[in-house]
């Protein structure tokens, strides 16, 4: 059955438009409460990033949950993976994160975790949607849910993250620039690296409700790259607005993406023979260099659709524990149930310390194929497969690549854009082909 409200990662949109308004969030909270409170008194954890609209959404969800008889624990600004961890740790029935991830402040959304810290199943999302479409009824007064602040949330998550780093190692001797994206990681990430011994230079760590992901964070690393060089740092770390993805920067100021980080982690595990990966899951956007490198090391590789939810689904089907996306969502089931930027960073820093090598050397294990990604804004829905102009452009693009590359056009699941990706052996041809396809998509939207 097709879902009416839920997208690929919860519910997301422009604040005040569509579903991201107080009225719908009130009803959503009530619907979630109805599903959870069918058989027992339930408790839900609510966290958020730093967007100004988080206050409104948090209050509306809280009221709806209470009206359904559900108790609420409020953590305030916390990374998405922290809510996944804490939901299971405190034995809550569900966790809710108010965030639009890497998007700017006018957007917001809501995503959910079950009691075990995993994203909700399709069946549970459909059950919630069914309740949304029913008339809202408030429980009697003595059954209303109570809300309380969870003041220990930051400390518990900080200690959990530190526990994933070997107790016989420290980060002493490392200078790290940490870009918090003016988002949910600002209050925890710098402390974690500092407490493990690193010299920390924190940037984009002063959120004001409007500056989340604004010329900072995992999707815009230019300032971080400059700061790593300026401070003569060993490494730079960039999170996105909700802290579930990671991009790093080596000491030369060069960006290291999710494919490269995933490759470093997989090969490290393979040689350690400790929790050696049976295989690694990437996505249809993962660089061919990742696939080829892993296969040279006899590590199986499979591709899922884009989205950490789909990565995790395929990991679970295969019985593998490591997977991720080029964008920096990396899931390591040895430690957590969802992408966690801090824990991924700690694993890379561990490898650096144990190998006594800089990130610039570690990333040499993978040779990336030239790849160009262009996001083309659209209005409404564009049927890529049936559009004659786009079909003609794809045919021409395939001729240009001459069988030595990949072409992918797909609508984003989180933004009104068509993503055009071209990959091949010749960077000039790849860029020319991508620009030609992007122009065809743009022309088709006029």
Curated annotation (Swiss-Prot):
Superkingdom assignment: Bacteria
GO CC term, one of those recorded: cytosol
Recorded coiled-coil stretches: none
Record carries keyword Ribonucleoprotein: no
Cofactor list: Mg(2+)
Key words of the record: Isomerase, Magnesium, Metal-binding, Phosphoprotein
Record note on modification: Activated by phosphorylation.
HAMAP family: GlmM_B
Name of the molecule in the record: Phosphoglucosamine mutase
Organism: Coxiella burnetii (strain RSA 493 / Nine Mile phase I)
